[in-house]
Design a protein with these regions (language model features):
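A conserved FAD-binding loop/helix module that cradles the flavin
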Residues: 335
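Active-site nucleotide/adenylate-binding loops and adjacent lid/helix of ATP-dependent enzymes
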Residues: 118-247, 251-297
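Peripheral (often C-terminal) accessory segments that flank ATP-dependent C-N-forming ligase machineries
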Residues: 3-5, 10-11, 21, 46, ...
């Protein structure tokens, strides 16, 4: 039985808001992540309200209530705050300057805006990782490749110069003509010492699922990029050789308690997550190091909420690739495979409830993203029904409109029975082949 009492918040304008507890959880965003947060809230018997632009956005169908407004509409977020105990975000595309006045007036964002600030851009993430001395990919801001500005030409009227003497000085050419001055071509952009092609160029903000990423193979690619983008908004990273891509989702509550889900392997198709394997086929020491990285980040930021970390594993050891201040595609398997899912953890934290157990309930799991393939709506529907009929398969359909090639339409999670690493890998391959016979991958040449 959940106790109920009156909660009061006094705004700076004197307005007093009274409401019963437990209060609603507020989410800015209405996509598939918000939809799964709403499903988790419903299981916990907690109301959840979303702010999202369209009535047919995925989360609206499962949320307790909704506010139809653009995500950047601050007045709509103010209204969301009036209905909710605290607010969290579905994604990191935030305008902190617009939200800061609300936080100053008492609106509670989790994570708070100060914790989010270094995580909203790839450049900010890289700087944070460097400050914490965490192993990450070597990088430089794109403007570092630009040549220094040319030195100013000497001005004959500068102090200490004798303009008359300069004008009366005899010619050294013997012809009476002023000598020709050869102006060298300005130097072009250059990679700094220690970097060599190929390198990865990334937009600092807004990139996801392969968007905002370019492979630069040579000097011509670099010069072409500089003609097309503002260098201040991009960075360059060394192209890292790696054996596997890994990910870990971690949570921290208001009291500083930290819980980590198991380390997983992720696989990409055209830079979009294709499948996730739990547990990752690595040693215990690798997972322990990943958990230490998570604790370091959460503690340094005084972060409250769910944080997801992507890693490279290879010759350079375990290197942090990117951070996501939210629930993450790599953690969808936790809905069935763990005691408390990443979505339930986020809802619990925002609602002020104790975290649940992240411990696994299965020996292993395979999560497969269902990306829109080449085909019409009936073809996708037939494939969806076939997947739903599979034994032991847990289908999550997001209810999105439109079949843009490669779009994430849902995901499927299947248990893996073996506790032996090699046998589990063989089981993963069998299950994946079975899924791909029903739901093919989109072609490699998608736009």
């Amino acid at each position: 039985m959940v106790r109920s009492w009156t909660f009061e918040r006094r705004w700076v304008d004197g307005t007093v808001l009274k409401r019963p507890e437990p209060a609603a959880v507020g989410i800015v965003g209405g996509g598939q992540l918000a939809r799964m947060l709403a499903a988790a809230a419903a299981e916990l018997k907690l109301p959840l309200v979303v702010q999202t632009p369209h009535a047919d956005d995925p989360a609206v169908a499962l949320a307790s209530d909704h506010i139809l407004a653009p995500l950047e509409d601050v007045e709509a977020t103010r209204e969301l705050a009036r209905r909710c105990r605290a607010i969290s975000f579905e994604n990191e595309w935030l305008d902190l300057e617009r939200l800061a006045p609300l936080e100053a007036q008492g609106v509670r964002f989790l994570p708070d805006l100060q914790s989010l600030k270094p995580l909203l851009s790839k450049r900010g993430q890289r700087q944070l990782l460097d400050e914490l001395h965490l192993n990450t990919v070597r990088w430089i801001p794109l403007e570092a490749v630009l040549p220094p500005p040319p030195a100013a030409n000497p001005d004959p009227w500068d102090a200490g110069a004798d303009p008359a003497a300069a004008m009366l000085a005899p010619s050294t050419t013997g012809s009476g003509l002023a000598p020709q001055v050869v102006v060298p071509d300005p130097p072009g952009p250059r990679l700094p010492e220690g970097f060599q092609f190929p390198v990865i160029a990334k937009a600092s903000e807004g990139g996801y699922d392969g968007k905002g990423i370019r492979l630069l193979n040579d000097q011509a690619d670099l010069e072409r990029l500089l003609e097309e983008v503002d260098p201040q908004g991009w960075l360059l990273e060394e192209k890292v050789p790696f054996e596997r891509e890994l990910a870990l989702t971690a949570c921290r509550d208001d009291h500083g308690n930290v819980a980590c889900f198991p380390l997983v392997e992720t696989h990409q198709h055209q830079q979009v997550c294709d499948w996730v394997l739990f547990p990752a086929p690595t040693g215990h020491g690798v997972e322990l190091y990943a958990r230490n990285v998570a604790v370091s980040l959460l503690t340094a930021l005084n972060y409250v909420g769910v944080l997801s970390i992507e890693f490279f594993w290879g010759p350079g050891g375990l290197q942090v690739n990117e951070l996501a201040p939210r629930t993450h595609n790599s953690g969808h398997y936790t809905i069935e495979a763990c005691g408390s899912s990443q979505f339930a953890q986020q809802v619990r934290i925002v609602a002020g409830l104790p975290m649940g157990s992240p411990e696994p309930r299965w020996n292993g799991a395979l999560m497969v993203n269902l990306l829109a393939f080449r085909g019409d709506e009936p073809a996708h529907e037939r494939a969806r029904q076939a997947l739903a009929a599979l034994d032991d398969a847990h289908l999550h359909w997001y209810g999105k409109k439109g079949l843009q090639l490669g779009r994430k339409l849902g995901h499927l999670t299947l248990p893996l029975q073996s506790s032996d690493r090699e046998q589990r890998e063989a089981e993963r391959e069998r299950q994946l082949r079975r899924i791909r016979e029903i739901w093919p991958l989109p072609p490699l040449n998608r736009p």
